[in-house]
């Protein structure tokens, strides 16, 4: 039934109640109570139907909200998030019981189950943040408010799926059992995302007024209804809610807001789990590789071939030249509306990719809006030039306060609200580093991405360690930054999944960093992430995950794989069609190192493949060398996600960018200039609200 018809029915019911009360005033109180109760139930049922109309799992939505005895749509929407939390907690508790005997008998199943418990806590945290922000229901820009809700709900979906994926290759029967007990929680979270994505329509349908907000001068003002995109710009940089909040029972709530549903023609996600194989080789058996490193493999930059392009082949590292340079005069920022979409018409930084280290990075430019002016100053300076005042210095030779990064992280105040700078001096640090969820506003500053290197060698083989646990460095604390650091995993191609860096933090920024490995080098796991002037190398799926990640002016280097393997740059893991996530490669370069070029005809390389049903990858204004196969994209299997994925290439250059022989799947899109702007950093990461005062050219489009 159309929602407006339902509203009419609701109004009619309310009118009937009023008439009964007016004309039957002398009736017994019991009769009046029954009429009230029945009318309230009918109104609640109608309201639930309207709320659930946009969801993919309507039966789960209506049956769960039927337990909430409130006709107020705001209470019902908040209860939808609460009920998802309860369902997830119930599911993981059930899973811990059902899998106990298997976990007791097998160490790897036990570790996967423990990882699941941790991930479910993270999924619940994101739902709590959503619920708490909805409870406050204060905003100056509806679209920014909904953006936060959708990012966190997308994160919750990803955490739940990561739990299930963790059993693949370890205990497939346990994976099936866990998927079964977690299914309802996944469905309710997906429904929550659908509700959030259509929140503006719900507010209008229920005629819920936008909230009163206090202006800067202290006067109260009310935001008018209508399109949220035309409202005054506000901040979406709210501090994280109290993580210790445990009020998860359905209760009363205020209202909230919305973001449009993804415009691509995508179908409803299936429940089947398609998990990433150990490698992409046609022959799946284990093979040795002469390229498996026997020590830290990244003491310097990998040589780049100079036969396939005309780009400079110098090092992209900046340790020998300071970023600050007074030679570059300030340049005025131009309006993003009047600026040409292709920044290369006026500026071609890609052809000078290796000279970016000479450009002056101002304290207020080039960074997303969550980067404070203080943090921008820190990113623009070099520690040895006394530009950064570190809270802690880490040095292997004992010249700092700490000898290990773990010791320095132990000094970060819990739920820190100010930037905590850790200067990591030159050296190779072989330690497993974790920035926990309670370590907020942490910043790593090194002496150069080839001089300060954090390394590890944990991999799936031979010990069957889950991909999530293989990371040399794991970043979970929000507002994390890293500058001039190298991250690597030296396990080698023969040991399959081996993550150098996993990022689950919201508002994470990486500048002039290297991420080096083979399979699964960089795990962009969840939330909003921005990479600038970075270098990522690997073989299979070496940028993967389900974050909302933008790579700007970065370099992606394909390395030599095992004998029968193919190389894939990206494997994006968007599972729900309404998730706002995706991988955007903007104004960058995709190339191969010297070891790969001799085998590129036999070991073909592709831009990406779909890890999950609604995988979304956008490559724009990027130099693509002839290391990429003319077909461009690789199937996961014969038919999986070919109709539901969203892959597009826009205004790229280079000998590997030709579209004539690209695959012709339904999910491969050709987009207009206007559509491309939605994926440019300014819009995709809300970068159009960045502070415009910059001394270097900046183009949000």
Swiss-Prot record:
Q: Which GO terms describe its molecular function?
A: enzyme inhibitor activity; pectinesterase activity
Sorted alphabetically, which keywords does the UniProt record give?
A: Aspartyl esterase, Cell wall, Cell wall biogenesis/degradation, Disulfide bond, Glycoprotein, Hydrolase, Secreted, Signal
- Give expression by tissue: Expressed in flower buds.
Q: Which residues bind substrate?
A: 467, 497, 609, 611
The biased composition feature labelled Polar residues covers: 276-287, 313-338
Q: What is its EC number?
A: 3.1.1.11
Where in the chain are disulfide-linked cysteines found? 534-554
Q: Which residues form the signal peptide?
A: 1-22
One Pfam family it belongs to: PMEI
Annotated active site: 520, 541
| Annotated region described as Pectinesterase inhibitor 43, given as residue ranges | 42-195
Q: In which pathway does it act?
A: Glycan metabolism; pectin degradation; 2-dehydro-3-deoxy-D-gluconate from pectin: step 1/5
Which residues does the record list as glycosylated?
Answer: 267, 637
Q: Which GO terms describe its cellular component?
A: apoplast
Q: Region (Pectinesterase 43): which ranges?
A: 391-688
- Per the record's keyword annotation, is Ribosomal protein included, yes or no? no
- Keyword Glycoprotein, does the record have it? yes
Q: What class of enzyme is it?
A: hydrolase
Q: Which Gene3D superfamilies match?
A: Invertase/pectin methylesterase inhibitor family protein (1.20.140.40), Single-stranded right-handed beta-helix, Pectin lyase-like (2.160.20.10)
Family per record:
In the N-terminal section; belongs to the PMEI family. In the C-terminal section; belongs to the pectinesterase family.
What name is this protein filed under? Putative pectinesterase/pectinesterase inhibitor 43
| Source organism of this protein record | Arabidopsis thaliana
């Amino acid at each position: 039934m159309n929602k407006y018809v339902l509203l009419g029915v609701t109004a009619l019911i309310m009118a009937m109640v009023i008439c009964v009360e007016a004309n039957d005033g002398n009736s017994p109180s019991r009769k009046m109570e029954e009429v009230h109760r029945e009318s309230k139930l009918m109104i609640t049922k109608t309201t639930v139907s309207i709320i659930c109309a946009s969801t993919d799992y309507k039966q789960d939505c209506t049956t769960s909200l039927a337990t909430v005895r409130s006709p107020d749509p705001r209470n019902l929407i908040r209860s939808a998030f609460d009920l998802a939390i309860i369902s997830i907690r119930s599911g993981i508790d059930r899973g811990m019981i059902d899998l106990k005997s298997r976990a007791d008998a097998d160490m790897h199943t036990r570790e996967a189950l423990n990882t699941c418990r941790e991930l479910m806590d993270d999924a619940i945290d994101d739902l709590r943040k959503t619920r708490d922000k909805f409870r406050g229901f204060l905003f100056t820009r509806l679209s920014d408010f909904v953006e936060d809700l959708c990012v966190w709900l997308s994160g919750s979906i990803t955490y739940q799926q990561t739990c299930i994926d963790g059993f693949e290759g370890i205990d497939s029967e346990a994976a099936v059992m866990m998927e079964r007990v977690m299914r309802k929680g996944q469905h309710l979270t997906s429904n929550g995302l659908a509700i959030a994505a259509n929140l503006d329509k719900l507010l209008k349908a229920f005629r819920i007024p936008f909230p009163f907000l206090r202006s800067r001068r202290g006067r109260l003002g009310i935001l008018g209804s209508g399109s949220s995109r035309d409202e005054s710009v506000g901040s979406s940089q709210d501090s994280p809610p109290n993580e210790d909040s445990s009020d998860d029972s359905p209760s009363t709530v205020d209202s909230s807001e919305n973001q449009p549903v993804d415009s691509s023609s995508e179908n409803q996600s299936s429940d089947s789990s398609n998990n990433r194989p150990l490698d992409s080789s046609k022959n799946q058996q284990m093979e040795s590789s002469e390229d498996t490193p026997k020590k830290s493999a990244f003491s310097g930059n990998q040589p780049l071939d100079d036969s396939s392009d005309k780009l400079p082949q110098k090092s992209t590292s900046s340790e020998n030249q300071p970023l600050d340079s007074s030679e570059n005069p300030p340049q005025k920022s131009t309006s993003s509306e009047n600026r040409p979409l292709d920044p290369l018409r006026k500026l071609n930084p890609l052809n000078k990719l290796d000279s970016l280290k000479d450009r002056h990075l101002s304290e207020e430019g080039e960074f997303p809006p969550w980067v404070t002016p203080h943090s921008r100053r820190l990113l623009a300076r070099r520690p040895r030039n006394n530009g950064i005042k570190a809270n802690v210095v880490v040095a292997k030779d004992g010249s700092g306060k700490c000898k290990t990064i773990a010791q320095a992280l132990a000094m970060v105040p819990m739920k820190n609200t100010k930037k905590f700078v850790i200067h990591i001096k030159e050296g190779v640090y072989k330690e497993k580093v974790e920035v926990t969820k309670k370590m907020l506003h942490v910043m790593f500053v090194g002496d150069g991405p080839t001089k300060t290197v954090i390394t590890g060698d944990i991999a799936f083989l031979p010990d069957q360690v889950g991909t999530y646990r293989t990371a040399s460095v794991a970043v979970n604390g929000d507002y994390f930054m890293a500058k001039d650091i190298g991250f690597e995993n030296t396990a080698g191609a023969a040991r399959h999944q081996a993550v150098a860096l996993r990022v689950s933090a919201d508002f994470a920024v990486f500048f002039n960093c290297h991420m080096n490995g083979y399979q699964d080098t960089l795990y962009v796991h969840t939330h909003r992430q921005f990479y600038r002037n970075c270098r990522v190398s690997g073989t299979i799926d070496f940028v993967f995950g389900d974050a909302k990640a933008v790579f700007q002016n970065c370099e992606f280097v394909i390395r030599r794989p095992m004998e029968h393997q193919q190389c894939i740059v990206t494997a994006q893991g968007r599972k729900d069609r309404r998730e706002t996530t995706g991988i955007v490669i903007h104004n960058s370069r995709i190339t191969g190192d010297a070891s790969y070029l001799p085998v590129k005809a036999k070991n073909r390389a592709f831009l990406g493949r779909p890890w999950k049903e609604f995988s979304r990858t956008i490559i724009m204004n990027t130099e693509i060398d002839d290391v990429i196969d003319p077909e461009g994209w690789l199937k996961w299997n014969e038919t999986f996600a070919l109709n539901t994925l969203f892959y597009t290439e826009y205004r790229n250059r280079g000998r590997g960018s030709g579209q004539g022989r690209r695959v012709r799947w339904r999910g491969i899109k050709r987009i207009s200039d206007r559509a491309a702007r939605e994926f440019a950093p300014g819009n995709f990461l809300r970068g159009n609200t960045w502070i415009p005062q910059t001394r270097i050219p900046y183009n949000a489009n």
